[in-house]
Amino acid sequence: VTTIALARVADFAALGERWRMLEAQADCSFFQSWTWTGCLAAERFPDPVLLEASQAGDTVALALFNRRRFLLRQTLLLGETGDGVHDTPYIEYNGVLTARRAGDILRDCLRAARRLPVAGMRPWLLRQLVMSSVEDATVEAARAVGRVAIRNSSPAPSIDLARLRESG
């Protein structure tokens, strides 16, 4: 059984320790690591919301969102601020940090992000999710649970130098 909760972040240093522990159990991109996510986190996330999924008491997924509010509507931005100045260092391979052993919980995590209360306050309207540069599986899971906006989606090209050298 997977338990999912949303909470405000009060201590980024403590979150960083937990995040790095989960990183060791995940196949994640650099852009999902605490090195990227935690860099200037207090400045980049003025209204941070942490999604945490656990199974048998162990954390199996974490996602750091920034919450933006406009009237009754709340928006959660995955791994970004929504502010062009702070989001200029562009995230390329974004997503929910998930342990290898967690199974297929992505859809449940994103559904929870739209619906669950934060600090005891349930949203008046279902939240919109905003994501940039997420994998196709994340896009599909997000669209399956409702309103989602996919922003920038242009990962930087890369070359496998070892393979290039081998080919001559």
Give residue ranges: language-model regions.
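N-acyltransferase acceptor-side catalytic subdomain
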Residues: V1-G168
